[in-house]
C-alpha cells in the first residue's frame, strides 16, 4: 500500500469520524461529564493496562526461546513500553510492533526474520483471541442487550479468522498462497504475511507452546477489556460488564485499521456508536472513549520516560552474544 493511499485513507476516515462526532455530541455536556470523572475508576483502568504488560513480555519470551533467543522479561517489558510510546506517533499499534522488532534485532543481529515472525505471530494469535472473546460476548448478551446491529461485523471477523487459519495452517493452501503472492507484493503485505507463515510453521510441531501462548493471550485480552468497562464507569455509564466483551474485541480490531492517526476520532466515534445503540447519551459515550484514549497515553508514559532517560544517559542497546 503506497504512502499516498494510506495518507488519503487516513484523512478521509478521520474526517468522517470527526464529522460524526460533531453531529452527535454537545461540547458543553461532554465537558461537564468529564469534569465529574470518578478518578478511582480511571486509575483502575490505567492499572489494568499497565500490570498486564509483564505478562505479555513473558509470553513473548516463550516464542523467542523456541528460536534459541534468550531475553530477560524486564528487558522485554521495557521493549513493550517503548513500543507503546512509539505507537502514539506511528500509525496504529502496528507501528509499535515494528519498534519492538528493530530494538530486539539490535541485540540479536541476523535474527530479523525470526524476531519479526514472533511479533507477527503474537498479533495473529491476539486477533484470533479477540474474535473468540467477541463471539463469547455476543452469546452472553443474548436476551439481555440488543447488540445485533454489530453481529455482521463480528461475523466478518470470525469468517476472516477461519479463512486465515486455513491459509496459514493447512498445507493444501500453499498453491493458493503462491498464486496470490504477486498481489501481496503489490500491496506490500508479502513480507509480514511470509513472516507469519514461517512463524506458524516453525511451531506446527509445538502445539502445547502455541496453546499456552494463545491461552495467555486470551486471558490478557479478557482482563484488558475490563479497562474499557472501568473507563466507562468513570463517567457514570452503568452497564453490565458483559456488554464490554462484545464492544472490547470489536474496538481492539477497529484500532488495527491502518488508516488512523493513532485511532484519533475513530475510537471515540466507535464508543458513541456502540454505546449509543444501548441507550447511552452521545456526550457520555464520547467522554468514555476520550478517557480510554487517556489510558493509552498513560500506558505510553513509562516508555517515553525510558527513552528520555536513555537519551540523556547516552546509552546504546547492547548486543547479546550467542553461543
Predicted segments, located by residue:
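Selective transmembrane-helix segments that form parts of the transport pathway or gating/packing helices
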Residues: 120-128, 293-297
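Extended non-transmembrane interhelical loops and adjacent amphipathic helices
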Residues: 65, 77-109, 193
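Mid-bilayer segments of alpha-helical transmembrane spans in multi-pass integral membrane proteins
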Residues: 84-94, 111, 123-135
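Re-entrant/interfacial helical elements at transmembrane boundaries that shape
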Residues: 96-105, 261-277
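Transmembrane alpha-helix interface/packing and boundary motifs in multi-pass membrane proteins
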Residues: 83-92, 249-264, 268
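Predominantly cytoplasmic-facing regulatory/coupling regions of multi-pass membrane proteins
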Residues: 1-81, 140, 145-256, 282-290, ...
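Membrane-interface alpha-helices at helix entry/exit sites of multi-pass transporters
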Residues: 73-78, 96-97, 107-122, 280-291
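Transmembrane alpha-helix termini and helix-breaking/packing motifs in multi-pass membrane transporters
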Residues: 132-144, 277
Amino acid at each position: 500500500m503506497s504512502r499516498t493511499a494510506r495518507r488519503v485513507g487516513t484523512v478521509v476516515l478521520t474526517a468522517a469520524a470527526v464529522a460524526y462526532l460533531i453531529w452527535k455530541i454537545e461540547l458543553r455536556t461532554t465537558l461537564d461529564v468529564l469534569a465529574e470523572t470518578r478518578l478511582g475508576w480511571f486509575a483502575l483502568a490505567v492499572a489494568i493496562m499497565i500490570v498486564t504488560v509483564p505478562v505479555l513480555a513473558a509470553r513473548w519470551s516463550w516464542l523467542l526461546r523456541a528460536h534459541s533467543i534468550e531475553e530477560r522479561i524486564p528487558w522485554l517489558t521495557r521493549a513493550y513500553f517503548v513500543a507503546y510510546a512509539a505507537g502514539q506517533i506511528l500509525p496504529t499499534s502496528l507501528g509499535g510492533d515494528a519498534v519492538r522488532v528493530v530494538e530486539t534485532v539490535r541485540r540479536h543481529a541476523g535474527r530479523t526474520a525470526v524476531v519479526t515472525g514472533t511479533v507477527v505471530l503474537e498479533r495473529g494469535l491476539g486477533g484470533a483471541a479477540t474474535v473468540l472473546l467477541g463471539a463469547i460476548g455476543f452469546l452472553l448478551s443474548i436476551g439481555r442487550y440488543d447488540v445485533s446491529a454489530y453481529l455482521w461485523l463480528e461475523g466478518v471477523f470470525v469468517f476472516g479468522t477461519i479463512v486465515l487459519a486455513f491459509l496459514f495452517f493447512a498445507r493444501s493452501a500453499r498453491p493458493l498462497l503462491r498464486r496470490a503472492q504477486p498481489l501481496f507484493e503489490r500491496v506490500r503485505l508479502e513480507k509480514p504475511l511470509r513472516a507469519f507463515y514461517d512463524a506458524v510453521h516453525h511451531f506446527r510441531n509445538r502445539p502445547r507452546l502455541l496453546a499456552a501462548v494463545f491461552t495467555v493471550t486470551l486471558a490478557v485480552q479478557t482482563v484488558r477489556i475490563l479497562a474499557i468497562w472501568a473507563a466507562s464507569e468513570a463517567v457514570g455509564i452503568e452497564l453490565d460488564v458483559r456488554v464490554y466483551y462484545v464492544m472490547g474485541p470489536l474496538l481492539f480490531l477497529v484500532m488495527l485499521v491502518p488508516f488512523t492517526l493513532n485511532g484519533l476520532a475513530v475510537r471515540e466515534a466507535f464508543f458513541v456508536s456502540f454505546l449509543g445503540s444501548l441507550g447511552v447519551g452521545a456526550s457520555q459515550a464520547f467522554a468514555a472513549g476520550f478517557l480510554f484514549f487517556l489510558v493509552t497515553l498513560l500506558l505510553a508514559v513509562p516508555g517515553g520516560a525510558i527513552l528520555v532517560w536513555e537519551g540523556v544517559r547516552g546509552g546504546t542497546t547492547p548486543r547479546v552474544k550467542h553461543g
